[in-house]
Amino acid sequence: MAAVCDICGKGPGFGMAVSHSHRRTHRRWNPNIQRVRALIGRGTYKRINVCTSCLKAGKVTR
């Protein structure tokens, strides 16, 4: 499943994991994506991928 929010488009962030000895390896931070049944239009429900910040902000009607 793609780590992208269908509401805001938030995707993974990329960076480096830095150890104590300063060795650097690539890593990614995925957003907290939940698969929810959301109300789309008039009485139509659809399963979409939504990040938890959009859920908390009330951007999705469940």
Curated annotation (Swiss-Prot):
One GO MF term: structural constituent of ribosome
Calcium as UniProt keyword: no
Biological processes, Gene Ontology terms:
translation
| An example Gene Ontology CC term for this record | ribosome
Organism superkingdom? Bacteria
Q: Which InterPro entries does this UniProt record tie to the protein?
A: Bacterial_rp_bL28, Ribosomal_bL28, Ribosomal_bL28/bL31-like_sf, Ribosomal_bL28_bact-type, Ribosomal_bL28_sf
* Protein name as catalogued: Large ribosomal subunit protein bL28
Going by the UniProt record, its keywords in alphabetical order are: Ribonucleoprotein, Ribosomal protein
* PANTHER family, A to Z: 50S RIBOSOMAL PROTEIN L28, LARGE RIBOSOMAL SUBUNIT PROTEIN BL28A
Q: Which family does it belong to?
A: Belongs to the bacterial ribosomal protein bL28 family.
Q: Which Gene3D superfamilies match?
A: Ribosomal protein L28/L24 (2.30.170.40)
Gene name as annotated: rpmB
